[in-house]
């Protein structure tokens, strides 16, 4: 039975409502926490600029940085390394842009515009003669002047634009990235409205300045002003990254190559993708990566040669090594000598202990006998020393010196003693001599032991000094590991005395006495400098083979076979220049420059582009049409003259033939202006004479 409260609601209903409210609150808190966590993680992810996916660093690393250093001569430079300077020549890009823009400009001309230019010229300078040779010369002069005017105006405008916006090292940096890492980080530059207006003003001013006296060239450039502005804008809108904050990496999971500059993603052009066949490591397929190991080997040999040249200048050098086996042998000898039983110090100590323990005369005699017997058993005559304790046992000395007693009744005769005190003096003298001898031997043994310990101490002291030098050297190498390459490179540029000092500090030599515990390992009695010529020739051949086979550069030689120059080929333009033009500058509509034109000057390239364009064809068409029209007019003017084979008024049977017309060969038509200096009737024909074909009066 439920208990009702004063507000007429049961306690169970109240608890249910509170439980629902609590659960709703908990759900709201969890949902808010989830949203906050998602937002925080996304915010932190954006702030870092990199997600949690594992990456493999490509640049900068020790390997890729060494690629760039050795590419520009900081490591292992040789003669063949100049091949790279041919490839990164910025004039190639400028000539490519010049040819492509000129070809596009000249192809945009119309035949109507060329015809109008001809009509204007014909109206100002009409042709009144009917001679075909004079007409041809007239047309050649007009076409040559038109050609020169257009080429001069176009060349002046494009030269100013290219040297203003293409006079940087972006193309060289692009080539450096291609041959080292194979990846080119690109930075898109945002153009401000003021910069765009300034660029447009510069282009218009360049066109106006170059075509003030060339109206047709001015009309042509004004009609293609959008193309000129596009070229100038694209040249300034893209930069090859050249900063220490550049980072290039590859994501492991998505296998994407990315680049960053100061934490922001930038565009990346892939020229040669690294191989990812090894875990957490990439293999580069660029030319410099192929030459890297050989270049480092050659550079190490050059540094070794320089150090040998600086250090090996003393008359004699000796390299010594420790003879540890001799030290061990000495230790063993000392131990054996220490363990000998005939040690003088032990004998004296033993004798003193025995004497102190003796309580009677017999004990003292036994101690003396034992002491003397241990030291010099072969020198002591026991019978003379102790007659009563001879080897035959105790006996009685009879009259005449006979000894009665001993084994088997042995009777011996002894020489008569010199006096009653002779045995006692012999024992005292012998004992005194033996004690002095023991003391001398003890002193000598201590001196020898001190000398041996001193020698051993010197040996270990030298060994400790060597170990300390090694530790100091290793510690200095570890501290200078980052600046080791720069320090070694300084040896090539420092003065000789300073370089010698640095080399001696890096590899010090000190005089060392060759003691008993050292042996000579090697010696130098003259200066030794290793040669690098063979390895340099080999490395030069590697550079040339790698670049010639990769980019197919072309070698120009003289008639004697000597090398004259190394230039781009058509394949090189397609392999290196066109990708930069299409993928980076976005100017793929421009025609590629032929390899024969890359050796020409700017003026010759403009002339070659004119010859390959529709402009030249339209001018030839106008000239051919005018020649045909003049021939038609000549035939119409000669209509009253009888044709060939008809009788004239001169009488029957007489034929008046028209003068044979001289035919112009194709070679003479191609030479054109070379026929100006011709002769007629024995004298030069001046086209500017009065009543001439050009209408000058």
Swiss-Prot record:
- Location in or out of the cell: Virion; Host nucleus
The entry describes its oligomerization and partners as: Homododecamerizes. Interacts with terminase subunits TRM1 and TRM3.
Which named protein is this? Answer: Portal protein
Q: Where is the composition biased (Basic and acidic residues)?
A: 664-689
Similarity comment = Belongs to the herpesviridae portal protein family.
Q: Name one GO cellular component term.
A: host cell nucleus
Q: Which UniProt keywords apply?
A: Host nucleus, Viral genome packaging, Viral release from host cell, Virion
Pfam families, sorted:
Herpes_UL6
The record's InterPro entries line, in alphabetical order, gives: Herpes_Portal (IPR002660)
- Its biological function? Forms a portal in the viral capsid through which viral DNA is translocated during DNA packaging. Assembles as a dodecamer at a single fivefold axe of the T=16 icosahedric capsid. Binds to the molecular motor that translocates the viral DNA, termed terminase.
Top-level taxon: Viruses
What's any GO biological process attached to this entry?
Answer: chromosome organization
Segments of this protein annotated with the region Disordered: 633-697
Presence of keyword Transport: no
